[in-house]
Amino acid sequence: MVPVENTEGPSLLNQKGTAVETEGSGSRHPPWARGCGMFTFLSSVTAAVSGLLVGYELGIISGALLQIKTLLALSCHEQEMVVSSLVIGALLASLTGGVLIDRYGRRTAIILSSCLLGLGSLVLILSLSYTVLIVGRIAIGVSISLSSIATCVYIAEIAPQHRRGLLVSLNELMIVIGILSAYISNYAFANVFHGWKYMFGLVIPLGVLQAIAMYFLPPSPRFLVMKGQEGAASKVLGRLRALSDTTEELTVIKSSLKDEYQYSFWDLFRSKDNMRTRIMIGLTLVFFVQITGQPNILFYASTVLKSVGFQSNEAASLASTGVGVVKVISTIPATLLVDHVGSKTFLCIGSSVMAASLVTMGIVNLNIHMNFTHICRSHNSINQSLDESVIYGPGNLSTNNNTLRDHFKGISSHSRSSLMPLRNDVDKRGETTSASLLNAGLSHTEYQIVTDPGDVPAFLKWLSLASLLVYVAAFSIGLGPMPWLVLSEIFPGGIRGRAMALTSSMNWGINLLISLTFLTVTDLIGLPWVCFIYTIMSLASLLFVVMFIPETKGCSLEQISMELAKVNYVKNNICFMSHHQEELVPKQPQKRKPQEQLLECNKLCGRGQSRQLSPET
């Protein structure tokens, strides 16, 4: 038997609930479900600030890395570790975050995560070394992962039933606003001395303010009931719903908590209610979220844009700001229209457009003849000084550059003479050419050469940027928000939290693998072929969505769960790929003629197996 879906359980994005009518009232929702006053809204917005902090931390490394890699002379692998260390922390937190949230509370977890984010950011700006950078980023990763889980659960549990989807979706909207804010910060401090410190430090005041504000907000009433504090839970519900009698909602919460004990974690891997199929669908879906390349665009946006012709840090950061703007603009209509268009439709459209834009970007990049083939920096100090001359201008090669002069003092006359062609190969604009560095004895893998902007035709550069923006927009309406909505719908309430924790761990794990190898893979095969690989993955995700993801538009959670609980669900979905929403809705039995009813009765009794129904005239 399929358990009744728990509408009080935590959900993500626009979770659908079953409409409830009270006797004789004609109202679609009971009184306690209609109470969504200003206090509930402000509490949700305050908690959703965590989403802004998460988005900011995800996007800020894109611009900060341009300065840090030069300052610390980071190698390709070291850059990947700086980026991926945040994901390492997030993965660790996703494995244990659910236990912490259930033991200490959702509100407390948000407060702790805000404080940890501020502490990690403070570590980054006070002391700069490679090791400290890794430690600080891991701390921030733990913070954003913990806050992501706690925020969605907290908002879902304080929101009334009919406003839960809207209020929980605030978190997703705040994430993309945070990413946009990070890209704006990258541009604002691109040419500022030690601008990376300002980039990392801007979130500290906001994190502290959120922690203080959350202290004065009430705990989740559901958490209080879990801890046996029903009196306190009743008072909190009274404030949130502006009602004096909260008995009915308390009864619903207690009933839903009983449902959760019907399942264990291991039921996710058993055939009970087709759970094994459901978890495989969920894990595969989050796999495609990461393997289609979006995390790398997020983390390495400025680096990618520099490789296609946006030469200066400022130009690359400004272009990446467009990525943030597109994400915000695309996410808003997707959030508002998902109940009308359907999550499966958005997933199909998003994957299709992603594939088209990626193949366009790959073809364009094949026709951009750059002066370099590698985007990794050397960790050699002499190469660092030479690279700084390109990034910060030819003035760094003058006799006023004490760092470079000290290097010359420590090398032999023969080695020094090998660098002399550099002087003669600097053209009128003071730019170092590829040939000059090669004549100096430096291999392609030991430096990053920034090309003359004139070497890249303007229309190719802007076409590449346009393809990137279309790719980002397609992801933002499809594989960005929709998988989390699907995940919140395909699992019963009694096991949804544990299923979400498992898929979240899978999400961060694949993210770690992708971000940890992006520069290395790009260095080996080139950016165009990376785009082509992501194209194949996008097409594979489209095929998977068409074959396995149900269209849940207009269906209640109970109807969705009943359909997915069928043993032959996957077989039916593959054979009949034209599933529509109405097929998930149980149909009312049609009235049949007496002859048909008799035939059906005989079949059930085993006496009419060979009989055929005569055609009606």
Swiss-Prot record:
**UniProt keyword terms in alphabetical order:** Cell membrane, Cytoplasm, Glycoprotein, Membrane, Sugar transport, Transmembrane, Transmembrane helix, Transport
Biased amino acid composition, Polar residues: 8-17
Residue span of region Disordered? 1-29
Q: Which residues lie on this side of the membrane: Extracellular?
A: 66-80, 137, 194-197, 300-317, 367-466, 520-528
Classification via InterPro entries: MFS_dom, MFS_sugar_transport-like, MFS_Sugar_Transporter, MFS_trans_sf, Sugar/inositol_transpt, Sugar_transporter_CS
Please indicate which superkingdom the organism of origin belongs to: Eukaryota
Spans through the membrane: 45-65, 81-101, 116-136, 138-158, 173-193, 198-218, 279-299, 318-338, 346-366, 467-487, 499-519, 529-549
**One GO biological process from the UniProt record?**
circulatory system development
A molecular function annotated in GO for this UniProt entry is: D-glucose transmembrane transporter activity
Write down the SUPFAM superfamilies for this protein, in alphabetical order.
Answer: MFS general substrate transporter
As annotated in Swiss-Prot or TrEMBL, what is the tissue specificity of this protein? Predominantly expressed in skeletal muscle, heart and prostate, with lower levels in brain, placenta and kidney.
Question: Which of this chain's residues carry glycans?
Answer: N371, N383, N396, N401
Instruction: List the signal peptide residues.
Output: none
Q: Which reaction does it catalyse?
A: D-glucose(out) = D-glucose(in)
**Cellular location of this protein?**
Cell membrane; Endomembrane system; Cytoplasm, Perinuclear region
Residue numbers on the Cytoplasmic membrane side: 1-44, 102-115, 159-172, 219-278, 339-345, 488-498, 550-617
A matching Pfam family: Sugar_tr
What is the recorded membrane topology of this protein?
Answer: Multi-pass membrane protein
GO cellular component labels = endomembrane system; membrane; perinuclear region of cytoplasm; plasma membrane
Which coarse location class describes where this protein primarily resides?
A: membrane
Q: Which PANTHER family match?
A: D-XYLOSE-PROTON SYMPORTER-LIKE 2, SOLUTE CARRIER FAMILY 2, FACILITATED GLUCOSE TRANSPORTER MEMBER 12
UniProt lists the family membership as follows: Belongs to the major facilitator superfamily. Sugar transporter (TC 2.A.1.1) family. Glucose transporter subfamily.
Role this protein plays: Insulin-independent facilitative glucose transporter.
- Protein name, please? Solute carrier family 2, facilitated glucose transporter member 12
